[in-house]
């Protein structure tokens, strides 16, 4: 199924509506409470809409995203709340335009207590919440008790970032040196193992990929070819640009590989069918006339939901 006109700012409403429906279903008389759905929210950092294999890209392979899109709903026209990371994420978790959140909608500013993200509502209703990687950032959160107006803790939930990759060793499993050290999947598994039996969960998987800086030429050892690339018309069609886009693709695939592992894990423990899975990006690719610009490749992002 394909929906063509749903902007990203309505994600919050859709999530809360689904969760609220589950909560209300368990409050009628003396009926057995309905099992509330889990939520896995996966958001990449700087990825344009065209760059998934489900969308037809020839140089990006995203089996994790494709699985969600194939089994659920794929949105062909989803637009981020901003072409920049922090404002877009602020809009997403509050359901408001980022400028309505004042400084809590501005890049690297302070997050004020008055702006309540939906994760707080989920936690208050009994959900187990957490995040790994990049949360609702970059923002400044309360550093000490003197920051009385600032929020204490990330607006994505409680951090689970213990597990890391070791760099510059022979067993470094990362496919490019520019990839972050956070082991997203292992942190998600740790989160799940600490959950109480039967407790519904909400988990924010925030990959730091495919944000720059890239390892130049990483595509060469990852089985990619310059002739695979579809260069957007606003960029020069040169070997340099094609190689840069392939390095970008390597990082998208890394983030997607962790999503695939999370889906497999949920399937193995019998929770996938009761989990709302949302996969998207905050804004477009980090290239000229894309990220930080209100052109199509700056705000048009991938978006798929399955349940």
Predicted ranges, named:
Residues 2-3, 7, 15, 19-307:
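Formylglycine-dependent sulfatase
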